[in-house]
Amino acid sequence: MSGSSGPLSWPGPRPCALLFLLLLGPSSVLAISFHLPVNSRKCLREEIHKDLLVTGAYEITDQSGGAGGLRTHLKITDSAGHILYAKEDATKGKFAFTTEDYDMFEVCFESKGTGRIPDQLVILDMKHGVEAKNYEEIAKVEKLKPLEVELRRLEDLSESIVNDFAYMKKREEEMRDTNESTNTRVLYFSIFSMLCLIGLATWQVFYLRRFFKAKKLIE
């Protein structure tokens, strides 16, 4: 960046790098691993837009050697409690579903067993949106060249970025409307409170005036 007081400049290939970072920025991938103690429940939550494909793979490493009847249950639900995927005695597998609304989704692992059993290692890899699409399969079906596949991916990614910005703009408008509505209600309440205080003060003046006249303290 130049030290002069003129407009900001980006020397070298920074615009390309910035565009590349923007395209890679909203990566919709959740890859996580954690230990799950016996007779415990751990949940992960994520907000996902509507009409998006969500895919995932999980693997649960059982270090108990089958002791204590250890079993792990997997359940994926939305904020309304609707079950999108469920698997009892889960060990390793994949899941996929399409969201119907913008919502908070919850992935829960629950371990059940008896005795002293080592913690299980849970590995979860969840993708949605562009990252969930299988472009290799799309290339085979539509007979696309590698460059065409990459252009398709960039097109989908650009559309995803535009949708994210559109959603953020919508949320900003909703929050602004809520803020304006709140300010209006506060203004009306302030005016009402002021009128009540003025009315109460006026009533007190007349009441005290009559009281003092009755006591003949004033004429």
Swiss-Prot record:
Region of interest (Required for TMED10 and TMED2 cis-Golgi network localization), ranges: 147-178
Keyword terms: Cell membrane, Cytoplasmic vesicle, Endoplasmic reticulum, ER-Golgi transport, Glycoprotein, Golgi apparatus, Membrane, Methylation, Protein transport, Signal, Transmembrane, Transmembrane helix, Transport
Lumenal side: 32-185
COPI vesicle coat-binding (motif): residue ranges: 211-219
A cellular component annotation (GO) from this entry: endoplasmic reticulum-Golgi intermediate compartment membrane
Recorded GO MF terms: protein transmembrane transporter activity; syntaxin binding
Pfam families per record: EMP24_GP25L
Keyword Glycoprotein recorded: yes
Function (record text): Cargo receptor involved in protein vesicular trafficking and quality control in the endoplasmic reticulum (ER) and Golgi. The p24 protein family is a group of transmembrane proteins that bind coat protein complex I/COPI and coat protein complex II/COPII involved in vesicular trafficking between the membranes. Acts at the lumenal side for incorporation of secretory cargo molecules into transport vesicles and involved in vesicle coat formation at the cytoplasmic side.
Protein's name in the database: Transmembrane emp24 domain-containing protein 10
Origin species: Mesocricetus auratus (Golden hamster)
